[in-house]
A protein has these predicted regions:
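Single-stranded RNA-binding surfaces
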Residues: 1-136
Length: 136
């Protein structure tokens, strides 16, 4: 079975179509929002590492940087990061099917072992911005 995902983005709407053997199976349309919502996924850039908090601040385009704690990286962060790095402009992307999983993140590790300032990472909003604090 041949599956194809088609994404169309314009200023007011995002459309995602799933086709199987060139037959439309599913179609989702969503109005574009300018705000940041829980569940949204962004490609961000690490702005600051805070070793004392075992956390980092990430620029995702919000007026305040997002906060990510070491425990929020997830056990498969190294594998996900390898995939994100391969998808950057000027690099040849990798196929997810053939990707080998990296060893999982240790629960007692340090964020500086996995992140560095200027690094691009994929993040998902778990908590919206409140008062003077950015998203988490």
């Amino acid at each position: 079975m041949n599956r194809e995902l088609i994404v169309n983005v314009n200023p007011t709407e995002i459309s995602i179509a799933l086709c199987e053997d060139k037959v439309l199976v599913e179609l989702n349309k969503e109005q574009c929002q300018t705000g940041f919502s829980v569940g949204d996924i962004y490609l961000g850039k690490v702005r600051k590492i805070m070793p004392g908090l075992n956390a980092a601040f990430v620029n995702i385009g919000h007026e305040k940087d997002a906060f990510i704690h070491y425990l929020d990286l997830g056990s498969q962060f190294p594998s996900l990061q390898k995939l994100v790095a391969s998808q950057q402009p000027g690099k040849r992307g990798m196929r997810v099917e053939g990707m080998k999983l990296e060893p999982p993140v240790e629960k007692t590790g340090k964020i500086g072992d996995y992140l560095q300032v200027g690094q691009n990472i994929m993040v998902q909003i778990a908590k919206e911005a409140i008062s003077t604090k950015g998203p988490r």
